[in-house]
UniProtKB/Swiss-Prot annotation:
The keyword DNA damage does not apply. Belongs to the UreD family. Required for maturation of urease via the functional incorporation of the urease nickel metallocenter. It is found in: Cytoplasm. The gene is ureD. UreD, UreF and UreG form a complex that acts as a GTP-hydrolysis-dependent molecular chaperone, activating the urease apoprotein by helping to assemble the nickel containing metallocenter of UreC. The UreE protein probably delivers the nickel. The lineage of its organism: Bacteria, Pseudomonadati, Pseudomonadota, Gammaproteobacteria, Vibrionales. Keywords: Chaperone, Cytoplasm, Nickel insertion. The keyword Signal does not apply. This is Urease accessory protein UreD. It comes from Aliivibrio fischeri (strain ATCC 700601 / ES114). Its main location: cytoplasm.
Length: 287
């Protein structure tokens, strides 16, 4: 594994958002920010749910840059966060960029963490960390989508590296701890790695139930076998696992749009299962 150089030569972007239930709505009651990470004012296409767009630096992330994102959802609050576009990690001359996400949801709180994909350019060096802290009565659905190289341009991730660590805890009990290490094209080719697929996605859902798991398994089977046009002709791989009340869906593919379509479909039906109706899909995804 190459040495990770966390040089301070880049800029620091740090944002903390605190959501609370106020009357019938969820409000962004406090924010702290340093650097170019920012949010638009929350809006309410659905009653009681604060939709928020997290705006990443428009110029992308370069070596030495640090992004820190902290989200706190109080009891009975309900927040949905997404991004207006992909987060791009550009080539590095030696310093490692980092993105750290800390997501906390209290009792009866509800967080939907739905960012668009990360794109890692060849020769980029990046370190990703995600820490999710949930109360046992919280609801959480979140995903991460990572693209190594730019397959649409036949550009492969020949050099560089990306490391990742995701921890999910419920009432301070660790349910999931997994790491990712991608070191150029060799790891993408390896059968124990990504099997020649340049895109890797993970979708996390808590709490799980047998009924919800069965519903999502059926959706995956129907979409892959009966609607292949939805997922393109690149033969993606998608599977679902239950871990101590947490559902984990993993996806390997060649294109962003099919992965987004898959995860969006599973998210919408999960929300319907929990709340009895389909959600309003963020309009920014259609632009």
């Amino acid at each position: 594994m190459p040495k990770i150089n966390t040089s301070s030569s880049g800029w620091l972007a740090d944002i903390s958002l605190f959501y609370e239930k106020r009357g019938t709505n969820t409000k962004l009651v406090h924010r702290e920010q340093v650097g170019p990470l920012m949010v638009q004012r929350p809006f309410y296409p659905e009653t009681g749910i604060a939709h928020t767009y997290l705006l990443h630096p428009p110029g992308g992330v370069v070596g030495g840059d640090q992004l820190n994102i902290n989200i706190h959802v109080s009891p009975q609050a309900h927040s949905l966060l997404t991004t207006p576009g992909a987060t791009k990690f550009y080539r590095s001359s030696g310093a490692t960029s980092s993105q750290t996400q800390n997501l906390t949801v209290e009792s009866d709180g509800f967080l939907e963490w739905l960012p668009q994909e990360n794109i890692f350019f060849p020769d980029s060096q990046a370190q990703l960390k995600t820490q999710v802290e949930l109360h046992k009565n919280a609801h959480f659905i979140g995903w991460e989508m990572n693209c190594f190289g730019r397959p649409v341009l036949d550009e492969i991730f020949e050099n560089g590296f990306v490391t990742g660590r995701t921890n999910i805890k419920v009432d301070d009990q660790l349910l999931l701890s997994e790491s990712m290490y991608i070191d150029s094209i060799d790891e993408i080719k390896h059968a124990a790695g990504m099997r020649h697929y340049p895109m890797l996605g993970n979708l996390y859902i808590y709490p799980a139930s047998e009924a919800l798991e069965e519903k999502l398994r059926t959706l995956i089977d129907e979409n892959f076998h009966e609607q292949p046009e939805l997922f393109g002709s690149s033969n993606p791989i998608c599977g679902i696992t239950e871990i101590d009340g947490l559902l984990v869906i993993r996806y390997l593919g060649h294109q962003t749009e099919p992965m987004m379509a898959c995860f969006s479909t599973l998210w919408q039906h999960t929300r319907q299962h929990w709340l009895g109706k389909l959600p309003e899909v963020p309009r920014i995804w259609a632009t």
